[in-house]
Amino acid sequence: MSDENLLTTLDTYLASGIHIGTQQKTEDMRRFIYRVRADGLYVLDVRKTDERLRLAAKFLSNYEPEDIMAVTRRVYSVGPLKEFGKVTGINTVAGRFVPGTLTNPSAKKFAEPEVLFLSDPRVDKQALKEAIEIGIPVIGMCDTEHLTSHIDFIIPTNNKGRKSVSLMYYLIAREYMKNRGLIGEEVPFSYDQFLEKAMNVKVKMNPSNRQRGRFQRRRR
């Protein structure tokens, strides 16, 4: 596999571990699996991940940042998610997703996004449940063992490693901003810079301050 037409180099993809799955697979994810290693780990097809990343960023670019909500409960995804929100302006929820955030207009953190982006649909099940209830599209980073019946757009990836998740968020942020004309080919932040900042974010999983308050849209 060459680097031609990839969003980043193959070496960068492999070094981040985005292709390393688990020892479990589902029929839903079979089409994204490249092979199984001798130790039983399923390996994702990097080219398919790259293709889906490109399409996800293109889809998201149809929305204003304030109309997108990106969510994660995974500790190792919090830093990358916060840096993603910082560079794009997209709203983020890190940690516990408070029930009613999308469905209860009386909730303190009630929000009305038009699309939901999940780092792990299985872990972020409360957010997924509410997105299904209100009928908004869901993009999800999915590993080899995921069931995807309620995910509108799948990004196959290792969604458990900090480096792999950081690369996913970096590439989507970069392509989202390019597609919206916010940046040109000269990207003002490199992957290394993004990764360094994401890795240095202090993770404080305090339920009282997990949701960022700037997602207070108008109530219809």
From Swiss-Prot:
GO terms for cellular component: small ribosomal subunit. It holds the Pfam family Ribosomal_S2. It comes from the Archaea. One of its GO terms (biological process) is translation. Keywords: Ribonucleoprotein, Ribosomal protein. CDD domains: RPS2. InterPro entries: Ribosomal_uS2, Ribosomal_uS2_arc, Ribosomal_uS2_CS, Ribosomal_uS2_euk/arc, Ribosomal_uS2_flav_dom_sf. One of its GO terms (molecular function) is structural constituent of ribosome. The keyword Ribonucleoprotein applies. Belongs to the universal ribosomal protein uS2 family. This is Small ribosomal subunit protein uS2. It comes from Methanococcus maripaludis (strain C5 / ATCC BAA-1333). The gene is rps2.
